[in-house]
From Swiss-Prot:
Keyword Oxidoreductase recorded: yes
SUPFAM superfamilies the UniProt entry points to: FMN-binding split barrel (SSF50475)
Pathway: Cofactor metabolism; pyridoxal 5'-phosphate salvage; pyridoxal 5'-phosphate from pyridoxamine 5'-phosphate: step 1/1; Cofactor metabolism; pyridoxal 5'-phosphate salvage; pyridoxal 5'-phosphate from pyridoxine 5'-phosphate: step 1/1
Coiled coil: none
Gene: pdxH
Classification lineage: Bacteria, Thermotogati, Deinococcota, Deinococci, Deinococcales
Protein name: Pyridoxine/pyridoxamine 5'-phosphate oxidase
Enzyme Commission (EC) number: 1.4.3.5
PANTHER family: PYRIDOXINE-5'-PHOSPHATE OXIDASE, PYRIDOXINE-5-PHOSPHATE OXIDASE
Length: 218
């Protein structure tokens, strides 16, 4: 039996690492995000480009999972996945999403919300072939993603068959069901933990010609 959990209501940390002032913010939220992500990478955080991706289906039922950020530029934030996955079905029905980056060691988090679109076939193919060969084959093996499977052995047998189909030196084609999505961010929030839970929060909202920046109550 596992050890009993401690009283979770008594567990807390004091956030004292830094503050975030309006004067500290870049007028462009993308540059602000790139700066914070760069600091997280320099600090040696484990996979600071990992994010929680929240989607909802047509009925409004939400779901969330962790994916990896694979691009951040003026077009938006990009990730790759199986289009037939749960998230892929959600985004086909309801093409909007919210992303959350949480960097505990820096006492920071970033939220980003916006409509979602698929990246071009060419962009998906270029990224697919930049991945390790084992990951390319695994993309084929894990289809249909999120579907029930009898056991681990069935998955490994499928992988072995694909490895035989695509021996070393043979190009692995990008499957039609796999590719990228880009979130065209229309709202950002930057959060810096502060003492006594009086955190610093700033929201950027796109207003058609520029970004409006507001401090939010903690």
């Amino acid at each position: 039996m596992p050890d009993p959990l401690p009283d979770l209501s008594s567990l807390r940390l004091a956030y004292t690492r830094a503050e975030l002032r309006r004067a500290d913010l870049d007028p462009d939220p993308l540059r602000q995000f790139q700066g914070w992500l760069g600091e997280a990478l320099q600090a040696g955080l484990r996979e600071p480009y990992a994010l929680s991706l929240a989607t909802a289906d047509a009925s409004g039922r939400p779901s969330v999972r962790t994916v990896l950020l694979r691009g951040a530029d003026e077009r938006g934030l990009t990730f790759y996945t199986n289009y037939e996955s749960h998230k892929g079905h959600d985004l086909a029905q309801n093409p909007q999403a919210e992303l959350l980056f949480f960097w505990a060691d820096l006492e920071r988090q970033v939220r980003a919300y916006g409509p979602v679109e698929r990246v071009s076939e060419e962009e998906s193919t270029a990224y697919f072939h930049a991945r390790p060969r084992e990951s390319q084959i695994a993309a084929h093996a894990s289809d249909p993603q999120s579907a029930p499977i009898a056991n681990r052995g069935a998955l490994e047998a499928k992988l072995a068959a694909l490895q035989a189909q695509y021996p070393e030196g043979t190009p692995v084609p990008r499957p039609d069901f796999w590719g990228g999505y880009r979130v065209r961010v229309r709202e950002w929030e930057f959060w810096q933990g502060r003492p006594s839970r009086l955190h610093d929060r700033f929201r950027y909202t796109w207003e058609g010609e520029g970004w409006r920046i507001e401090r939010l109550m903690p």
